[in-house]
């Protein structure tokens, strides 16, 4: 199935790109510049596209991102430290982000004759991000069926929506994903900070999967404290 992968450059989406490529269906990667403070992730998406030998389309959505205020990812608020499941991480929500990006990706699929759009939303995202939940992805498919009725048919592929990030690490390793060439940290510094929710989740996922983590962190041990505090709460 000819498939576009929505690729941020993060561990999840790059692993998904490698999986789809191994299945023989990858046609292109699509990424979005929405003014995110961790824009360096797009460089890792470009690396993945070159490695996999497919076109990489970067959609400039900085004007859209500028009006999606209130998120630490696009505004001046600090990205909080701690586990993803913490209530404080809600400040990293960018309203309607996945709905907007997937709509553009489906339009591209219809225009270019691709049959599917794959996105790496996973079970660990459900607590914080409503547009990563099964209810959203199912409703989005129904909306696109209506939007493209009589013009094109495209499927939304969400192979990780009921799986954990540790499962994604396992799947990525199976398909030789170079994890060191992915970017997760929301703070966008020279190294992964090791303290924000996505760094903690990344470090924990490698631990649970039993696979060595090649990532260099500014604080490589904070994740244990964050998990312990979550468990005590």
From Swiss-Prot:
Q: Give the EC number(s) under which this enzyme is classified.
A: 6.3.4.20
Pathway(s) served: Purine metabolism; 7-cyano-7-deazaguanine biosynthesis
Describe the family membership recorded for this protein in Swiss-Prot or TrEMBL.
Belongs to the QueC family.
Kindly list the biological process annotations in GO that this record carries. Answer: queuosine biosynthetic process
Tell me the InterPro entries matching this sequence. QueC, Rossmann-like_a/b/a_fold
Matches recorded under PANTHER family: 7-CYANO-7-DEAZAGUANINE SYNTHASE
Q: For ATP, which residues are the binding ones?
A: 7-17
Species for this entry = Paracoccus denitrificans (strain Pd 1222)
What Gene3D superfamilies would the database entry show? HUPs (3.40.50.620)
MF term (GO), any: ligase activity, forming carbon-nitrogen bonds
In the record's cofactor note, how is the cofactor described as bound? Answer: Binds 1 zinc ion per subunit.
The coenzyme or cofactor needed here is:
Zn(2+)
Q: What is this protein called?
A: 7-cyano-7-deazaguanine synthase
| Reactions catalysed | 7-carboxy-7-deazaguanine + NH4(+) + ATP = 7-cyano-7-deazaguanine + ADP + phosphate + H2O + H(+)
Q: Which residues bind Zn(2+)?
A: 185, 193, 196, 199
Q: What does this protein do?
A: Catalyzes the ATP-dependent conversion of 7-carboxy-7-deazaguanine (CDG) to 7-cyano-7-deazaguanine (preQ(0)).
Which keywords annotate this record? Answer: ATP-binding, Ligase, Metal-binding, Nucleotide-binding, Queuosine biosynthesis, Zinc
Say which enzyme class the record assigns: ligase
